[in-house]
């Protein structure tokens, strides 16, 4: 596999973690160092930029500030902000660039009690209001 195009740059926009399929779509994948370099499939995308952003999101969630990204300016790595704040900024940029019709929500995992509280809050409007 040719890794000469590290990051943005080489001929006609090669991105890290992105391959062009013969039929014109772009495939994104990343290697998981926690699983001995096992490939993790990220999906097939209409544009190389969408695939590169999917790679960046996976790389940042796996490696944090140590990740080598295609679009590092979309992640506030140098400042002291939390990863959820940095991801919120990149998610909006990624969502606006995506031509996909599906809606994706991402939550930073804190602990089970926070998840349970969020789920309970979501069920409250369905139970009716008591005065």
From Swiss-Prot:
Residues 80-103 are annotated as: Disordered. GO terms for biological process: ethylene-activated signaling pathway; positive regulation of abscisic acid-activated signaling pathway; positive regulation of cellular defense response; positive regulation of DNA-templated transcription; stomatal closure. Residues 14-72 bind DNA. Gene3D superfamilies: AP2/ERF domain. InterPro entries: AP2/ERF_dom, AP2/ERF_dom_sf, DNA-bd_dom_sf, ERF_plant. Residues 80-101 have a biased composition (Low complexity). PROSITE patterns: AP2_ERF. GO terms for molecular function: DNA-binding transcription factor activity; sequence-specific DNA binding. It is found in: Nucleus. Keywords: Activator, DNA-binding, Ethylene signaling pathway, Nucleus, Transcription, Transcription regulation. GO terms for cellular component: nucleus. Its main location: nucleus. The keyword Transmembrane does not apply. It comes from the Eukaryota. Probably acts as a transcriptional activator. Binds to the GCC-box pathogenesis-related promoter element. May be involved in the regulation of gene expression by stress factors and by components of stress signal transduction pathways. Belongs to the AP2/ERF transcription factor family. ERF subfamily. This is Ethylene-responsive transcription factor ERF096. It comes from Arabidopsis thaliana. The lineage of its organism: Eukaryota, Viridiplantae, Streptophyta, Embryophyta, Tracheophyta.
């Amino acid at each position: 596999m040719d890794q000469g195009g590290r990051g943005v740059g080489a001929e006609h926009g090669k991105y890290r973690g992105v391959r062009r399929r013969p039929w014109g779509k772009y495939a994104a994948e990343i290697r998981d160092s926690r699983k001995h370099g096992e490939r993790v499939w990220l999906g097939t995308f209409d544009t190389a930029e969408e695939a590169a952003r999917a790679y960046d999101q996976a790389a940042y969630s796996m490696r944090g500030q140590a990740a080598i990204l295609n679009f590092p300016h979309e992640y506030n790595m140098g400042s002291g902000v939390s990863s959820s704040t940095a991801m919120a900024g990149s998610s909006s940029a990624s969502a606006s660039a995506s031509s996909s019709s599906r809606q994706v929500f991402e939550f930073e995992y804190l602990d089970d009690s926070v998840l349970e509280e969020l789920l309970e809050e979501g069920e409250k409007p369905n139970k009716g209001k008591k005065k």
